[in-house]
Amino acid sequence: MEGRTAFLPSRDGLRFSNAWPPGPAVSVRTPLGRVGIGNAARGLCGGMVFAALDYWRTGQTPPPARPGPDDPLFRFIVRRLIDSWHVPWGVLRYYRWMRRPDQDLLRQRTVAAMWPQVKHSIDTGRPAPLGVVTVASANPLLIGHNHQVLCYGYQTEGSQVRLAVYDPNSGPDDAVLISFDPVQSGDPEFTHNLNIGWPVRAFFLTRYSPAQPPGAPTR
């Protein structure tokens, strides 16, 4: 791989996928009203991305088993989910991007602005948390249908770019990719094998601040 960090999903990702039984929704206040983003049944992708990155940064091995609702790791993942949304402004960012036309999202925001930032992060050894916009809607209740992944490497071939990502929905899988062509004429498209039921419309770099995860054996 042309550019990569030391993170590898099969080794450093959480050992379980983003599938949870129904649990209490965590409702947060935003300028758009209250938005529930912590219902475990709807997924905890952002919390899993941040938690995996926290374990990696501290040199700890992620726990091997899926935590129950009273487990400190589960509570930590939920807390990191809220952190990953950067309430309220992060929620508004998803909403603004959901409402924009594909041409603007792809060329001006993702390809021209975000891809160079992601590349720089990888080139300096820092995995890049990404907010993935999948929804085209003005309905704020659909914000939670967007997704979050962790980019840990990239490969270019001609004008084609392939991002290697840790997708919590896929578990510790090293073969998950998002691909695009930044110089494609017309409206460029993203191809991907993320474990989601929607197209990828755009992505942006998510601001990450480390946190201390629940104790685990040191490598």
What are these regions, as identified by a protein language model?
Residues R107-V165:
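Active-site-adjacent substructure of cysteine-protease-like catalytic cores
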Residues P22, A51-W56, A136, Q155-E157, ...:
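Short loop/turn segments at secondary-structure transitions that flank enzyme active sites
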Residues G3-A112:
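Cysteine-nucleophile protease catalytic domains, especially the papain-like/related folds used
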Residues L142-N146, Q155-R219:
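Cys-His-centered catalytic/binding microenvironment captured across papain-like cysteine peptidases
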Residues A19, M48, V133, Y166-P168:
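Structured loops at beta-to-helix junctions and adjacent beta-edge loops in soluble globular domains
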Residues M1, F7-F16, P21-T30, N193-R219:
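Aromatic-residue hotspot detector
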